[in-house]
């Protein structure tokens, strides 16, 4: 439903509408990218400890989806903990790339990667990208650009070390659309650790590569950091985004999304969710989700061509417990618009995803 006065209809000042769709085939943990009129969607299905990943696409912005393509070897992916699942990127010539935490014993969990075949009809057999930096726990991430570069990130201890303080962010890079990856190396060597069971989010575009992750300095400084590279991942600069003094693993996730005016980033801190604009390797003008927070988690952000922003998050989720999904539209000046919504019945272990249509309306997927 649109909430706009008749006075404004003729001049196009009606705010964007928000619709919701459920993940196809009862899946969970959707990851969505809309590019060139195609909505790319992956999801998880099966037992949370050992399940399957599937990919579908839509050419009518979620009204219908294609027949699912299997992504992984059955049982080689996990959904448990919400933040260890698959992530999605679309690179040169629309090729789809996927990376996820493998389902394996702690200490030898692989960072798995696959891509859509040249024919576009199936996914290649998955590959483990870890050579030396074992110790995967919280979810990794990936990004791809239009020049054929693919970047996969994860955090793990320095080889031979243990503990969150000794965790670092690692990068494996491909320059040929994911055909071959270089061995992993440190992306950022500042000794601030990484929150062991927390996720990451990576994004690449013409401005460079950006990565959000949570530190674990002295085990209680679990701050959000933004890493940025302008040289195709050879080096990264880091900036602290938000401080959180907590001596526990908070199992958080982040999001980064492109807009007509640059990038937006979203994160969680002290049981509240925020988003802000990425500028010169920093995040500026953070905005909190409105209202009284009730254990808000798993934020996502999307923006349309009019400069409006959809911000969504979950409320009340916990270990083995679902909750609700909440959302708020913000106008081009960053002020809350009339579109505020909530939906109960958010599934256990799931996530929410969002994208904008060409007409400016938004779609939430959960």
Place the predicted regions along the sequence by residue.
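Extracellular, repeat-based ectodomains that mediate carbohydrate processing or recognition
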Residues: 16-366
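Bacterial N-terminal signal peptides
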Residues: 4-12
């Amino acid at each position: 439903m649109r909430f706009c006065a008749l006075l404004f209809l003729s001049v196009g000042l009606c705010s964007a509408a928000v619709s919701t769709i459920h993940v196809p085939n009862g899946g969970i943990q959707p990851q969505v990218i809309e590019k060139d009129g195609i909505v790319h969607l992956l999801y998880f299905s099966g037992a949370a400890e050992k399940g399957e990943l599937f990919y579908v696409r839509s050419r009518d912005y979620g009204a219908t989806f294609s027949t699912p393509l299997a992504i992984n070897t059955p049982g080689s992916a996990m959904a448990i903990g919400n933040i260890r699942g698959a992530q999605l990127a679309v690179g040169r010539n629309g090729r789809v790339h996927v990376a996820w935490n493998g389902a394996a014993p702690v200490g030898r969990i692989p960072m798995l990667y696959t891509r859509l075949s040249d024919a576009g009809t199936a996914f290649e057999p998955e590959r483990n990208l870890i050579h030396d930096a074992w110790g995967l726990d919280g979810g990794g991430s990936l990004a791809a650009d239009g020049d054929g570069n693919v970047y996969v990130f994860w955090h793990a201890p320095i080889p031979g070390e243990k503990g969150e303080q000794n965790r670092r962010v690692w990068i494996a890079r491909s320059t040929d659309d994911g055909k071959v990856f270089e061995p992993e190396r440190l992306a950022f060597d500042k000794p601030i650790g990484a929150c062991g069971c927390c996720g990451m989010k990576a994004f690449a575009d013409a401005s460079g590569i950006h990565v959000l992750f949570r530190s674990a300095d002295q085990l209680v400084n679990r701050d959000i950091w933004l890493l940025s590279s302008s040289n195709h991942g050879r080096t990264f600069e880091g900036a602290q985004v938000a401080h959180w003094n907590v001596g526990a693993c908070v199992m958080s996730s982040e999001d980064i999304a492109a807009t007509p005016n640059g990038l937006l980033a979203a994160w969680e801190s002290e049981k509240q969710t925020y988003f802000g604009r990425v500028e010169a390797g920093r995040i500026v003008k953070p905005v909190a989700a409105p209202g009284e927070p009730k254990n808000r988690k798993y934020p996502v952000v999307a923006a349309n061509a009019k400069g409006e922003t959809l911000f969504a998050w979950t409320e009340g989720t916990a270990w083995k417990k679902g909750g609700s999904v909440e959302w708020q539209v913000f106008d081009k000046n960053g002020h809350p618009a009339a579109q505020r919504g909530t939906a109960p019945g958010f599934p256990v272990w799931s996530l929410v995803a969002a994208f904008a249509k060409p007409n400016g309306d938004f779609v939430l997927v959960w």
